[in-house]
A protein has these predicted regions:
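Helix-to-loop junction immediately C-terminal to a conserved catalytic motif
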Residues: 58
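The feature captures the beta-strand-to-loop junction immediately N-terminal to the Walker
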Residues: 43-45
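Conserved ABC ATPase signature
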Residues: 118-119, 144-148, 152
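Catalytic Walker B motif of ABC-type/P-loop ATPase nucleotide-binding domains
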Residues: 169-173, 178
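Single conserved hydrophobic/aromatic residue that forms the stacking wall/gate
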Residues: 1-10
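Conserved ABC ATPase "signature" region
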Residues: 107, 122-140, 165
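Conserved ABC transporter NBD signature motif
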Residues: 66-74, 83
Length: 193
């Protein structure tokens, strides 16, 4: 039902929030098609619903109306397991992570592919190291996550999403917290991918 070669197709979708007594509509009539291999940026003023749209596209919250297809399949029909191997997400939310090395956090991107115990195979470890190298954070790999600056943490979360090896990756403000040279570096990396 999606367009041939499209990764994502949004048709007449409405986004917002349900509460017990009401629904808050953030945006309606959203239409878009994003094709494989494209780097697409969503720009807009603060408060217009960019993050709400991203959370909806990631299936973190339900859409209010319309249709969202990812790889030709309605987002509402994906299981949690299917979502974790289809969509990678990097949010700007800061979570406090203690007692974990950067390499271990990036390795968590492999969790959709590991067994119950989460043990990384030789291939998983290779993918983790490749993801770390792609984002150029090799010097951070053995550091504790809680010691990182905001910009360093952002790069680590991008490496984690890359290690997840999903066909679709959503990034909410991927250059937030980064200094100018790092912003340029991340945008070049995303363009290269």
């Amino acid at each position: 039902r999606g367009l041939v070669g499209s990764e994502m197709c949004i048709r007449d979708s409405s986004i917002g929030y349900h509460s017990k007594s009401s629904t808050k509509l953030v945006a309606k009539g959203i239409h878009s098609t994003i094709y494989s291999g494209e780097l697409t940026c969503l720009l807009g003023a603060n408060g217009v619903g960019k993050s709400t749209l991203l959370r909806t596209l990631s299936a973190f919250q339900p859409k209010l109306d319309g249709e969202i297809l990812v790889l030709g399949k309605d987002i509402d029909t994906y299981s949690d397991k299917e979502l974790s191997t289809t969509i990678g997400v990097v949010l700007t939310d800061k979570c406090e992570i203690r007692n974990m090395l950067v390499r271990e956090l990036v390795g968590m991107g492999r969790s959709p592919y590991t067994g119950f115990w989460g043990k990384l195979s030789k291939d998983d470890k290779r993918i983790v190291e490749e993801s770390i190298a792609l984002v150029r954070i090799e010097e951070l790999a053995s550091r504790m996550v809680h010691t990182l600056s905001d910009g360093e943490r952002q790069k680590v979360m991008i490496a984690k999403a890359l290690a997840q090896e999903t066909p679709v990756i959503y990034l909410d403000e991927p250059t937030a917290f980064l200094d100018f040279p790092s912003k340029v570096e991340i945008m070049q990396l995303l363009h290269h991918l």
